[in-house]
Amino acid sequence: MDDDSRGLRVMATSEKPLSPRDPPAEFLPLLKQSGVFSESRFEEVRSKVLAGDYPIDAQELARRLIQDRLLTEYQAKRLLSNRPGSLMIGRYVILEKLGSGSMGRVYKAQHRMMDRVSALKIIAPEISNNERVVARFQREMRLVGKLDHPNVVRAFDADKDRGILYIAMEYVAGESLGQRLRTKGPIPAAELVG
């Protein structure tokens, strides 16, 4: 089991990944179960498959949905691996993995109703039962929620879904702080307090 499946307590319909020639009869239920698409978007895709406008094998269908920007590569990989439950946390659709650390993982995610892209920080389930970790996470959520500075990412939401603690924060595209420091060196103080 990989880091993502452990970290999100995957709910799959079976343990068997889809083979390259599995029909959409296998892929479409996973797509629906994943929650990535609204009901109307799912029906639109299903209709295109039935009409012959979309490919009939699972791999080709996934490729086409990526090409049409309806799925991300990360989402397609999870679905083809028969892990649809790992693509929704609360009201957030997971788009891609951004990174991981000792406390958990960070994903690029989109709020289903608000259509806002966020960085979704998820505490690893292995440590989310630890009272000290939960207390630390709750303190972090409260503190980040009170911060308002142009150089600090804002927190939008925090909750628990299926036992998974998460916080949704402002998504800032570009390199990480670690990457920035490695490539350009220390950041001048004037730029930090800017």
Model-derived features: where do they sit?
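Short N-terminal regulatory/linker segments that flank and modulate the kinase catalytic core
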Residues: M1-L95
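Conserved ATP-binding/catalytic core of the eukaryotic-like protein kinase fold
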Residues: P23, L31, I66, K77, ...
